[in-house]
Swiss-Prot record:
<feature type="repeat" description="TPR 3">
    <location>
        <begin position="182"/>
        <end position="215"/>
    </location>
</feature>
<comment type="function">
    <text>Involved in the regulation of genetic competence development. Inhibits the activity of ComA, a transcriptional factor that regulates the development of genetic competence. Acts by binding to ComA, leading to the inhibition of its DNA-binding activity. May also affect transcription independently of ComA.</text>
</comment>
<comment type="similarity">
    <text>Belongs to the Rap family.</text>
</comment>
<keyword id="KW-0677">Repeat</keyword>
<feature type="repeat" description="TPR 1">
    <location>
        <begin position="101"/>
        <end position="137"/>
    </location>
</feature>
<feature type="binding site">
    <location>
        <position position="43"/>
    </location>
    <ligand>
        <name>Mn(2+)</name>
    </ligand>
</feature>
<dbReference type="InterPro" id="IPR019734">
    <property type="entry name" value="TPR_rpt"/>
</dbReference>
<dbReference type="Pfam" id="PF13424">
    <property type="entry name" value="TPR_12"/>
</dbReference>
<dbReference type="InterPro" id="IPR011990">
    <property type="entry name" value="TPR-like_helical_dom_sf"/>
</dbReference>
<feature type="binding site">
    <location>
        <position position="40"/>
    </location>
    <ligand>
        <name>Mn(2+)</name>
    </ligand>
</feature>
<comment type="subunit">
    <text>Monomer. Is monomeric either alone or in complex with PhrF. Interacts specifically with the C-terminal DNA-binding domain of ComA. Interacts with PhrF.</text>
</comment>
<keyword id="KW-0479">Metal-binding</keyword>
<feature type="repeat" description="TPR 5">
    <location>
        <begin position="262"/>
        <end position="295"/>
    </location>
</feature>
<dbReference type="GO" id="GO:0005737">
    <property type="term" value="C:cytoplasm"/>
</dbReference>
<keyword id="KW-0802">TPR repeat</keyword>
<dbReference type="Pfam" id="PF18801">
    <property type="entry name" value="RapH_N"/>
</dbReference>
<dbReference type="GO" id="GO:0030420">
    <property type="term" value="P:establishment of competence for transformation"/>
</dbReference>
Length: 381
């Protein structure tokens, strides 16, 4: 007869499992996940331990989705994130202390992946109120890193840089966290890009790419190539940007990294429209739309429709306004600023200064929203 396994021994294994998740060590994390799952049925009754397991399984899947699509990896019996989230939500009322921290932190990570940035900040702020229960310095670095990502997407540059610095200082003290270190370099770079400090941005992107290449991580290699292209694009160096986007697309397609393809195809499409290379733009536009539909990416589908409204429909101002309303409803103010600039420049280049002026005014209004954005994140916890 098989003996009962103590919950403390399984708890130690879950801690070890989480260590491998944070290191992005998929084989070790998968091995422990399967082992722990088998042992749970033989474990003494402990509801908190079952909750801890559910939270860690959710975090495990977030790691897998970040690095490689589950469909490509063909990992057996891997539950969907949405199903895991539903299961954990049902048990939320029982969460206290460290488990409550994990729930809010992991849920914030999920919302961040869904590009629901304000919702992500809300959960991260709740997690921050429970950070007192976290004794592990690497876990604190994880929290700082995700806060930095969130503030970057909301264009709160100095908040993002400060959290990235705190995370980097911890990660560099520990071995086996090279992936997070290279991601910190990417965060520094993207924030420098927003500050228009292009040389600093390129330096950090190149460092990140070298590290991603050494780690043999195609997702991170592709993203870094994309970001270097983005840096060139931001300086209106369109011809220089194109090769980087092509290389990023090649990496994503070769490795079947579907979620990253709409973004890469969008910018290479937009560049070709700006350069007046309409036939090539159509080709990229078609592929980008197809990948967006396949990925179920509603935001990029709407962005490809925006390109059609601006460059192929006259422009269609009603459709453009509808797109702007959509971005505003999602609080995607940084994206709204960029697209309003594109429309303003479109009209300015065609010497329609009245309409250009109206859209430049829109840009200023959006910048006011971004600059005043800190108050949006003062969320009661």
């Amino acid at each position: 007869m098989t003996g009962v396994i103590s919950s403390s021994s399984i708890g130690e294994k879950i801690n070890e499992w989480y260590m491998y998740i944070r290191r992005f060590s998929i084989p070790d994390a998968e091995y422990l996940r399967r082992e722990i799952k088998q042992e749970l049925d033989q474990m003494e009754e402990d509801q908190d331990l079952h909750l801890y397991y559910s939270l860690m399984e959710f975090r495990h899947n977030l790691m897998l989705e970040y690095l490689e699509p589950l469909e490509k990896m063909r990992i057996e019996e891997q539950p969907r994130l949405s199903d895991l989230l539903l299961e954990i939500d049902k048990k939320q009322a029982r969460l206290t202390g460290l488990l409550e921290y994990y729930f809010n932190f992991f849920r914030g990570m999920y919302e961040l992946d869904q590009r629901e940035y304000l919702s992500a900040i809300k959960f991260f702020k709740k997690a921050e109120s429970k950070l007192i229960f976290v004794k592990d310095r690497i876990e604190k670095a994880e929290f700082f890193f995700k806060m930095s990502e969130s503030y970057y997407y909301m264009k709160q540059t100095y908040f993002s840089m400060d959290y990235a610095r705190q995370a980097y200082e911890i990660y560099k003290e520990h071995e086996a966290y090279n992936i997070r270190l290279l991601q910190c370099h990417s965060l520094f770079a993207t924030n420098f890009l927003d500050l228009k400090q292009y040389e600093d941005a390129i330096s950090h992107f190149q460092k990140a790419y070298s590290m991603a290449e050494a780690e043999k991580q195609p997702q991170l290699m592709g993203r870094t190539l994309y970001n270097i292209g983005l840096c060139k694009n931001s300086q209106s160096q369109y011809e220089d940007a194109i090769p980087y986007f092509k290389r990023a697309i090649a990496v994503f397609e070769e490795s079947n990294i579907l979620p990253s393809l709409p973004q890469a195809y969008f910018l290479i499409t937009q560049i070709h429209y700006k350069l007046g290379k309409i036939d090539k733009a159509h080709e990229y536009h078609s592929k980008g739309m197809a990948y967006s539909q396949k990925a179920g990416d509603v935001i990029y589908l709407s962005e490809f429709e925006f390109l059609k409204s601006l460059y192929l429909s006259g422009p269609d101002e009603e459709a453009i306004q509808g797109f702007f309303d959509f971005l505003e409803s999602k609080m995607l103010y940084a994206d709204l600023e960029d697209f309003a600039i594109d429309v303003a420049k479109y009209y300015h280049e065609r010497k329609n200064f009245q309409k250009a002026s109206a859209y430049f005014l829109k840009v200023e209004q959006v910048r006011q929203l971004i600059q005043g954005g800190v108050s949006l994140y003062e969320i009661e916890v």
